[in-house]
């Protein structure tokens, strides 16, 4: 399989330099970048007036939660979870998760996400959906034991079942992570088991961390230390840990995270919508912490549009700190691409020869994206997910001219509507 994308503005390399060039993709890698390439290809895409960008990496989400979109808004996190989300989740069966994951991944493809990190339950169904639709995903089962030994055994069994299932797929696009939910829902015994198993298998870990004031207070009261201090004492924190949120971190905790080379995933829309707080982005970046970007689940966002997430991240920190230079367009663009790839040890998030061909084409032939001048600025501050025209994952075209080629979009929309009408 080969693809030639011609006549586009290319966001090139780690520095995000804009060049006018063609891109030749062979198998699943970017093979050649240059002007007026004459190579023959199975697919030729004319990108005149368009921008060729690395695909976005959504480093924290819960894809099947699109089923809960609009279920409950404008309330606190704990009320939202206890009174709305958890009661509906108890009704969700495997078939619901499968169709929810198809809708979530469909939305991601149509808004330019090529890789995502997911945590939920019945994750074998998510893996099936991902394999079918053609995205790249890192999937985890959200483990919660609340200190109960019997529950812990069940969670361990579910996690190992998912690991075995994903390995049986032998897919280059579907990978397993360990997913202990959070320090306040997982016992030290479970967290220690995860750490040991991650070391043994070489698999990565994703976890929620210090999303709200309340959970930090709970940990302090129970253990006499902060969440990061607790995890560090357990030997949990290493460079294979991807921690979502990191809103309520002390300076000491930031220092520990930097020392352990942990990635923090910023979820500005969710943090703002649930009134959770504002992460200390400036301090994290100054300390050298790798900060990636995520949407969180659609129930608390309420979409999976990484372009919108970049804009929110950029604007939030400017107004919160009264510093217009903070979270500039290039910084948040890298959070949505290169930093996510770094967290996942993935040869993607950048357009250069030899990188994985996870590439999107953004249509700039639109009033809100003209004149074509500062392209990164336009993507962050002016564009939206609907401007993504073509999505390529692992060297395969999964969306061309806004048409998703791998599945029947209308069928997914109809099926999910029927499911949700019955569930609610």
Curated annotation (Swiss-Prot):
Co-factor: note: Binds 1 zinc ion per subunit.
InterPro entries in the cross-refs: Amidohydro-rel, Deaminase_MtaD/DadD, Metal-dep_hydrolase_composite, Metal_Hydrolase, MTA/SAH_deaminase
This enzyme's EC code(s): 3.5.4.28, 3.5.4.31
Recorded catalytic activity of this chain's protein: S-adenosyl-L-homocysteine + H2O + H(+) = S-inosyl-L-homocysteine + NH4(+); S-methyl-5'-thioadenosine + H2O + H(+) = S-methyl-5'-thioinosine + NH4(+)
Names of the cofactor(s): Zn(2+)
Keywords assigned: Hydrolase, Metal-binding, Zinc
Molecular function GO terms recorded: 5'-methylthioadenosine deaminase activity; metal ion binding; S-adenosylhomocysteine deaminase activity
Function (record text): Catalyzes the deamination of 5-methylthioadenosine and S-adenosyl-L-homocysteine into 5-methylthioinosine and S-inosyl-L-homocysteine, respectively. Is also able to deaminate adenosine.
Family in the record: Belongs to the metallo-dependent hydrolases superfamily. MTA/SAH deaminase family.
UniProt-recorded name of the protein: 5-methylthioadenosine/S-adenosylhomocysteine deaminase
Gene that this polypeptide is encoded by: mtaD
């Amino acid at each position: 399989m080969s693809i030639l994308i011609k006549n586009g503005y290319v966001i090139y390399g780690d520095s995000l330099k804009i060049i006018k060039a063609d891109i030749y993709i062979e198998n699943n890698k970017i093979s050649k970048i240059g002007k007026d390439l004459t190579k023959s290809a199975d697919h030729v895409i004319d990108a005149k007036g368009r921008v060729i960008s690395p695909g976005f990496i959504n480093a924290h989400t819960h894809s099947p939660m699109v089923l809960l979109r609009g279920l409950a808004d404008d309330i606190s996190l704990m009320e939202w979870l206890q009174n709305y989300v958890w009661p509906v989740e108890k009704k969700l069966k495997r078939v619901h998760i499968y169709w929810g994951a198809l809708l979530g991944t469909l939305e991601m493809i149509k808004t330019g996400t090529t890789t995502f990190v997911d945590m939920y339950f019945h994750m074998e169904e998510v893996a099936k959906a991902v394999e079918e639709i053609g995205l790249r995903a890192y999937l985890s089962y959200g483990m919660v034991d609340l200190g109960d030994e019997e529950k812990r055994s069940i969670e361990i069994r579910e996690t190992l079942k998912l690991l075995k299932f994903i390995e049986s797929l032998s897919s280059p696009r579907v990978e397993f992570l360990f997913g202990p939910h959070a320090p306040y829902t997982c016992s030290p015994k479970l967290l220690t088991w995860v750490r040991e198993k991650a070391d043994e298998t070489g698999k990565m870990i994703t976890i929620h961390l210090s999303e709200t004031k309340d959970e930090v207070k709970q940990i302090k009261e129970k253990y006499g230390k902060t969440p990061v201090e607790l995890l560090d004492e357990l030997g949990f924190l290493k460079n294979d840990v991807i921690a979502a949120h990191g809103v309520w971190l002390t300076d000491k905790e930031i220092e520990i995270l930097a020392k352990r080379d942990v990635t923090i995933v910023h979820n500005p829309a969710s943090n703002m919508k649930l009134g959770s707080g504002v992460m200390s982005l400036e301090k994290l970046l100054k300390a050298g912490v790798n900060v990636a970007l995520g949407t969180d689940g659609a129930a608390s966002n309420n979409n999976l549009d990484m372009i919108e997430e970049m804009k929110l991240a950029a604007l939030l920190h400017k107004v919160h700190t009264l510093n217009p230079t903070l979270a500039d367009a290039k910084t948040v663009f890298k959070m949505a691409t290169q930093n996510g790839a770094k967290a996942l040890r993935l040869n993607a998030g950048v357009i250069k020869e030899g990188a994985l061909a996870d590439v999107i084409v953004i249509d700039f032939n639109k009033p809100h994206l003209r004149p074509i001048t500062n392209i990164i600025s336009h993507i962050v501050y002016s564009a939206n997910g609907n401007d993504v025209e073509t999505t390529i994952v692992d060297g395969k075209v999964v969306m061309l001219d806004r048409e998703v080629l791998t599945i029947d979009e209308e069928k997914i929309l109809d099926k999910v509507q029927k499911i949700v009408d019955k569930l609610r």
